[in-house]
From Swiss-Prot:
Plays an important role in the elongation step of protein synthesis. The keyword Transmembrane does not apply. This is Large ribosomal subunit protein P2v. The lineage of its organism: Eukaryota, Viridiplantae, Streptophyta, Embryophyta, Tracheophyta. It comes from Arabidopsis thaliana (Mouse-ear cress). InterPro entries: P1/P2_N_sf, Ribosomal_P1/P2, Ribosomal_P2. Belongs to the eukaryotic ribosomal protein P1/P2 family. The keyword Phosphoprotein applies.
Length: 114
């Protein structure tokens, strides 16, 4: 993702042919590391292709994916509502465990300093 973002930033800034050095400079300017293999793979995949063409193809693929994934989104949305109800029970059990541990750590002093 860093490589793609750096490439698009270079293109948006007016650099018609960003080089490997340009991408490294952009990524390293924000303190991130970049993998040379990923850069090489990226440039081999986009060789002789236009960015707007690549974006258009990507949009078409995303549109095709989103039309088939509607049922999954609905199913996962319903399951998300049950999670908060289960969470307080786990919090309560953790509190009980902590209280139990504290009482055991008294060393027989029966909460002398509480």
């Amino acid at each position: 993702m860093k490589v793609v973002a750096a490439y698009l930033l270079a293109k948006l800034s007016g650099n018609e042919n960003p080089s490997v050095a340009d991408l490294k400079k952009i990524v390293e300017s924000v303190g991130a590391e970049i993998d040379q293999e990923k850069i090489d793979l990226f440039f081999s995949l986009i060789k002789d292709r236009d960015v707007t063409e690549l974006i258009a193809v990507g949009r078409e693929k995303m549109a095709a994916l989103s039309s088939g994934g509607g049922a999954v989104a609905v199913a996962s949305g319903g399951g998300g509502g049950a999670a908060p109800a289960a969470e307080p029970a786990s919090v309560e059990s953790k509190k009980k465990e902590e209280e139990k541990e504290e009482s055991e750590d008294d060393g027989g002093m029966m909460s002398l300093f509480d």
